[in-house]
């Protein structure tokens, strides 16, 4: 019986802030591809400033009648307000009297039901910000080209099948959001928007960019993620001011050599494409800090590429075809903070490859073909998160004791039969995952891991636990399911912070110690498929609180009831 009091978190994207004071919340578009990276995936970044956050509470704003909207317009005119926010009013039609608000510089119409705008909006000649996200717009009035001062136009989450022709004529624009529409093409007239510093056209159906994109010489951020691009025009190299370029989730087969002209770029997202090679010219992008090549068809990098990228701190090569580490020696990792090589075919970490990696804190080697670790393994003293899951490791070297900064260690799905005594030296360890190995016992030294909060030992061959387990008083999660445990030590009662305890599928576990009643914070206890004959079925059905109460009543702790 398992009683779960877990907390499911609904999440929603936070959309980027518009210029001025506006905020808008958008809807996340699922890409259908699961990211299973273990140790802190490096740089699945989103240049549209999108991050996952819990759903906000439902809006309490009442649906507006046309009369109420007109009242708002009148109030704005009387107060001579320069900012008008009519977001989330369920507006179907914007009154033509909007034309009277010529003093406006900011107009926010997020999350309404607009299918069109009245041409009178073109009378608002002082507008700097026009926010129209989350409506049902299919077009825009030609009168918008009267907005000679407009700098920010937000058209995210509408039903546009093309970029309205009038948009290309608003040459004052510096920020243009077109995310999550149904746009298939970008016209040559994009060159007219030469003042753009931010262009987001992610999550559309665009198959190619015109050569004229290269005339946007002021672009700093270009986000074309989640489209259908197979190639980039070589003219992209003319956009030399770009610092953020997001091309993830396209169908890119190659990159132009001119990519090396982007001397200011510091973030380059290329994950989930069809690249088989990276141009050598990328070595000239010396300001690059984050490079994400996850889920492509790359087997080698140009020799010396990483050594040339002297500011690179985050590198993701996960889900490619690498059979060995990139050629370039130890110097190529001297600035790297996070390295993700998950899901490749690497069978060896070269000796000394991290001898200059003094800031390397996160290494993910999950799902490779490692059978052993290098002899200098113990010198990785800066390592904080280490993921070696799903390999073929049969033992961990004793000099693991040198990894004194380690906080998260994942060794699940290997062939380990025992742990080294040196494990006890990892005093900062907070999470230790040993699921699905062949462990028959744990060393007593595990008692020294007093900061440990999560210990996963599921699916091993453990018959007992060391009594020192009771010293892990910060433990909140203990997974012991699918083992051969015959009993639990009474010291388990000292785990005063334990919240989740999994004991399921231990066929030799016939009883629970009365001391378990002292674990007052237990909210999840899984005991399925354990022959616990001393627990009445109705007690088991009641969940952790009933079981704890029963153990108190039956044992020496009844005075605590």
Swiss-Prot record:
GO MF term (any one): volume-sensitive anion channel activity
Claim: Metal-binding is one of the keywords in the record: no
Entry keyword set: Cytoplasm, Leucine-rich repeat, Nucleus, Repeat
Protein name: Leucine-rich repeat protein SHOC-2
GO biological process: cyclic-GMP-AMP transmembrane import across plasma membrane; intracellular signal transduction; positive regulation of Ras protein signal transduction
Annotated compartments: Cytoplasm; Nucleus
Each LRR repeat, start to end: 80-101, 103-124, 126-148, 149-170, 172-193, 195-216, 218-239, 241-262, 264-286, 287-308, 311-332, 335-356, 359-379, 382-403, 405-427, 428-449, 451-473, 474-495, 497-519, 521-542
PANTHER family, per database record: PTHR48051, RAS SUPPRESSOR PROTEIN 1
Biased composition (Basic and acidic residues): 1-36
Family that this chain belongs to: Belongs to the SHOC2 family.
Highest taxon of the lineage: Eukaryota
GO CC annotations, alphabetized: cytoplasm; nucleus; protein phosphatase type 1 complex
The keyword Repeat appears for this protein: yes
Entries under InterPro entries matching the protein: Leu-rich_rpt (IPR001611), Leu-rich_rpt_typical-subtyp (IPR003591), LRR_dom_sf (IPR032675), LRR_domain-containing (IPR050216), LRR_R13L4/SHOC2-like (IPR055414)
Species annotation: Danio rerio
Role according to the record: Core component of the SHOC2-MRAS-PP1c (SMP) holophosphatase complex that regulates activation of the MAPK pathway. Acts as a scaffolding protein in the SMP complex. The SMP complex specifically dephosphorylates the inhibitory phosphorylation Raf kinases, stimulating their kinase activities. The SMP complex enhances the dephosphorylation activity and substrate specificity of PP1c.
Region listing for Disordered, in residue ranges: 1-67
